[in-house]
Amino acid sequence: MQPLQNAGYDRAITVFSPDGRLFQVEYAREAVKRGTTSIGIKCSEGIVLAVDKRTTSNLVEATSIEKIFKIDEHIGAATSGLVADARALVERARVEAQINKITYSEPIRVDSLSKKLCDMLQMYTQNGGVRPFGSALIIGGVYDGICKLFETDPSGALIEYKATAIGSGRSAAMDIFEDQYKDDMNLNEAINLALTAINEATEHETTANNVEIAVIKCGEEVYTKLSQEEVQTFIDEVVSEEESEEESEE
């Protein structure tokens, strides 16, 4: 039996509850919280996007699971939540990037793309016959040498971050960022920090098979996904550092 205060107000997306809540939007946020962990970090040398893409079965081909997407040459996105919803948002973002390039003969700005996407997300919270997207995105990119990192929300809210996380491991990851993030860290340090956060969120079950990492360097402004071998090298570094810290504490 549903709580009396929720009765009737969680059925229609366009109806506020007496205390000013849209329950369908809150339920969409819960779908994001149940997703795997995705990380975004802005550093002095560029943007790092990292995701946990663990599967529920050994029969699933790991290469078929995609949680990081290339939006444009200089922009990438990491997702969490309902996979199909995330794919639809990514396709819309790609279309917006293409429209901007055709119309203005230049790449789209990271903040402009993020705002356009969130404008659409917001429309899905106030129209009948639709539902909010049960997915959130971390959008990162470099434009004119300036790094930008944004987090979207099913409500259409848009927040710029230095480092952020979405999904089931958000709390653990954000605690690590609060403690270890530095504005002047280089790309390798940012990758190690992202892996440390994912390792904590996954209870130290991180492997090159279930982690995906993409970077966008300030100088090049080109989205690049790391190979499994490169990811494993960084994982080995993180594990080695954690073991050294444990030994020093003893």
From Swiss-Prot:
Top-level taxon of origin: Archaea
Alphabetized InterPro entries for the sequence: Ntn_hydrolases_N, Proteasome_alpha, Proteasome_alpha-type, Proteasome_asu_arc, Proteasome_asu_N, Proteasome_sua/b
Gene Ontology CC terms, in alphabetical order: cytoplasm; proteasome core complex, alpha-subunit complex
An annotated GO BP: proteasomal protein catabolic process
SUPFAM superfamilies listed in its UniProt record: N-terminal nucleophile aminohydrolases (Ntn hydrolases)
Main subcellular localisation: cytoplasm
Name of the protein described by the UniProt record: Proteasome subunit alpha
